[in-house]
């Protein structure tokens, strides 16, 4: 709702290839003509409601609002920044938002840190990806679990393998299938 109120439902999505760029250069590129931007790094999964970070950012007069999850209070790669945050920086110098810029903004009083809620996982390796998948499949506390109430009239596309411990409920139609016992 906050996004709609502030931007009248017109939100621009920029996907930036950061190959050879620092995160500061990528965020600058994504800003285009905007005065502030919500940046969400693509290598993380987070269930924290983004409207909360927007609300906190709008209620403070700072250059940056960042979501944190680590016990070290490091930014999680989800932040809102204003253009003014970059004015004193050398545009050619490789700099990292979460390692360099946001910590400096916190020290100077120009940033607000928000404690993240819910699930957060940074995915930087194949092992981290698999760990995240396992967590989402087997953690009973995941609020986004699919239940019979999520969808109605859904069709499952082929091919589908139904393995051990899967329940096929009455009313299900299985056609043109091989059954291995």
Language-model features: where?
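Left-handed beta-helix
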Residues: 152, 157-158, 163-164, 169-170, ...
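Conserved small/polar residues in nucleotide/adenosyl-binding loops
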Residues: 180-181
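Long, charged amphipathic helices and adjacent flexible linkers at domain junctions
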Residues: 137-159
